Amino acid sequence: MIVFGGEDRSDLFLPDSQTNEERKQYDSVAFEDVAVNFTQEEWALLGPSQKSLYRDVMWETIRNLDCIGMKWEDTNIEDQHRNPRRSLRCHIIERFSESRQPDSTVNEKPPGVDPCKSSVCGEIMGCSFLNCYITFDAGHKPDECQEYGEKPHTHKQCGTAFNYHHSFQTQERPHTGKKRYDCKECGKTFSSSGNLRRHIIVQRGGGPYICKLCGKAFFWPSLFRMHERTHTGEKPYECKQCCKAFPIYSSYLRHERTHTGEKPYECKHCSKAFPDYSSYVRHERTHTGEKPYKCKRCGRAFSVSSSLRIHERTHTGEKPYECKQCGKAFHHLGSFQRHMIRHTGDGPHKCKICGKGFDCPSSLQSHERTHTGEKPYECKQCGKALSHHSSFRSHMIMHTGDGPHKCKVCGKAFIYPSVFQGHERTHTGEKPYECKECGKAFRISSSLRRHETTHTGEKPYKCKCGKAFIDFYSFQNHETTHTGEKPYECKECGKAFSCFTYLSQHRRTHMAEKPYECKTCKKAFSHFGNLKVHERIHTGEKPYECKECRKAFSWLTCLLRHERIHTGKKSYECQQCGKAFTRSRFLRGHEKTHTGEKMHECKECGKALSSLSSLHRHKRTHWRDTL
């Protein structure tokens, strides 16, 4: 029985379907499979603190094995000395002794451990294997258990020599690719039964060390302690050169190499060097093309596990990084950090023309094109040039229709799965995002966030002119009113627009494309927003309510116009005489009194008038004459 904290946890280690015989097979190799071993090259790179941590982890491992009454195999003397597992024990004890204080010895017996003497070759072992002392019969020595000297195990492919057979086996696995232990639940394979057991524990959400704050479970106490620091904020490892602190020693070591320039891991293919092993492994996969991490939902594979975790959020909808200023949430940290720069404007890469800051050089380059007008991405099919690569990719899908995510209903293709899911809901009518204030539902989360600001009145994106906006895209579009920039031009008529959305809507006037049809009256519209607005005529829905007098409106523009009655605000001012108006069309009509422009002509008498309302009044004079 495996007991942690008074609770029987035997079920964590093996699936229920496995037989007692299979359990015995796992138990018989338990120590060697859970032992953490380093090659000689890796061990030389470890510092005193890391070696001390290694000792703590191994002690804890053996205490756990001691709890389940682990015994060591008793084979004949010849087999013992040929057995690579015995060499591994000797190897680890040697490493374990190195990590102890100078005044400690391997023969020291820790308190509370009862050694049990084996009948074979006078070997003495405590059940807590690394906490005990070991003696070997002088006539029977394992494979040169010493730090220097002969290295009898040489790998044929890479030429690396090893003191210990287990180190040789560890090196051999990447070449042979041999993985012997399969998880019956997910099919993943492992090179040792110990790794399989740990995988099963993690998969079942188990582990003896459970965080009281978030409930996450861990197999190793060292990992548990590291995790706890994410809650406490403790950073015990401080760089002596720049005072930057880290919660994990390995992160501290990686950082130190930024000062020393040390890069001990060199790629055999291209000689590129890396400061840490994980970066080296990730780089190697760019040569081999290996993508071991596969998404269970769509089959897409990734070279690193973190990329898989981020990708899986596109299926689950999980967005753990939320902006406290505007409420927008993100799948991964990088996007969140880039978003925050939009609020602060203090990115490290500054535009020399307008002073705006960006998080990376590529974002700055894209922005600079709005000043220079440069459009380096040209479509070979239609000749259209675009300033951003993402816009170019989206444009190419219009020609090819072969985006990775294709709608089965209308055939439209999309690059991003989240955008594709939002589009699918235009066909199904599904609206999973509901407002807690008024119960209104939306197809995409961004629409819900925009709607919620109508309740809170929050407008987090502020222009230098004082005007504020609900979302970043509206803010961007507004900025072009100051610069006068209209980078999106219609190829048909030459009309230019400040944003791509306006251009797309305009294009449909040439194409006569109206894909969105009203189910009630069959009237068709060029874009989805117009259809939704039109449907309110049939439903009588009036979602926009005045907070002053409770009058409701079908459209936001009507509400905004109405609110000016209460506020007396006149946003539209004539630049020639200073007269202000509540609506833009009133301003346009007024401006014609200065220019003398008369666009509206009476068909009866040919008289031209400056406004449509004036024309209607004039027409009545003809009607009176006929009466």
UniProtKB/Swiss-Prot annotation:
SUPFAM superfamilies: beta-beta-alpha zinc fingers (SSF57667), KRAB domain (Kruppel-associated box) (SSF109640). CDD domains: KRAB_A-box. It is found in: Nucleus. One of its GO terms (biological process) is regulation of transcription by RNA polymerase II. The keyword Membrane does not apply. Keywords: DNA-binding, Metal-binding, Nucleus, Repeat, Transcription, Transcription regulation, Zinc, Zinc-finger. A zinc finger (C2H2-type) spans 181-203, 209-231, 237-259, 265-287, 293-315, 321-343, 349-371, 377-399, 405-427, 433-455, 461-482, 488-510, 516-538, 544-566, 572-594, 600-622. Pfam families: KRAB, zf-C2H2, zf-C2H2_4, zf-C2H2_6. It comes from the Eukaryota. GO terms for cellular component: nucleus. One of its GO terms (molecular function) is DNA-binding transcription factor activity, RNA polymerase II-specific. Belongs to the krueppel C2H2-type zinc-finger protein family. May be involved in transcriptional regulation. This is Zinc finger protein 442. It comes from Homo sapiens (Human). The lineage of its organism: Eukaryota, Metazoa, Chordata, Craniata, Vertebrata.
